[in-house]
Amino acid sequence: MTKADQIFKANIQKIINEGSLSEQARPKYKDGRTAHSKYITGAFAEYDLAKGEFPITTLRPIPIKSAIKELFWIYQDQSNSLDVLEAKYNVHYWNEWEVDQTRTIGQRYGAVVKKHDIISKILKQLAENPWNRRNVISLWDYEAFEETKGLLPCAFQIMFDVRRVGEDLYLDASLTQRSNDILVAHHINAMQYVALQMMFAKHFGWKIGKFFYFVNNLHIYDNQFDQAQELLKRQPVASQPKLVLNVPDGTNFFDIKPDDFELQNYDPVKPQLHFDLAI
């Protein structure tokens, strides 16, 4: 059993046994019903990527390709356009969060990255002083929230630090997320930001180090408990999945493509489970 599978099962069981029930919930199911959830707060996990510990479960298939394409839309294209997401990456699930028939998700995610020129600033800071302690990407922009409607960012902050081990430099990353649907999105979000960590590391020719993941509200929606029980029953496969970025060290951040990523040794338990999403 992988470390990710151990953490996944432990968190599911903890939510079932110890979780609190949501009140005044905002999300809705497609039929209009309020999407309540059971949740825990303050969930934390640590993965040593350098030792092959990657935050992806083998208990069900995780759609990593579309997740990485979404990441590129946010941090390379720096876009909030649904047309760009569909035409360039053939990703459609963000249509559920279109704002007022604008074909955008409002001033969120990529729009905030572009507004503050965040990626260029982080690359410059790391180039000038890899050991600086100010490498913070934050998507939490109150001014943008007031400017337009839109889903507030779930995974909203990632920080980077560099460590020297012998002759090698390792890039660590810490992801903070305000809210996470553990059964559907937990490993999608984690692997997205591992991919981002790898892109920064490749840009500088560094090795990937540790990945820290903090979720403030980790929940299971009230229409997902059958799937949760099924996941607890499943026996994980023996393989150790690994995400690889197949470009030379020193490849510019903006020259990396989604197809440069390869998920190796991934043979998840099937069949896939169906989830009715809360919007």
Curated annotation (Swiss-Prot):
Its EC number is 2.1.1.45. DUMP binds at R133, R134, R178, S179, N180, D181, N189, H219, I220, Y221. (6R)-5,10-methylene-5,6,7,8-tetrahydrofolate binds at D181, A278. The active site is at C154. It is found in: Cytoplasm. Keywords: Cytoplasm, Methyltransferase, Nucleotide biosynthesis, Transferase. This is Thymidylate synthase. It comes from Streptococcus pyogenes serotype M12 (strain MGAS2096).
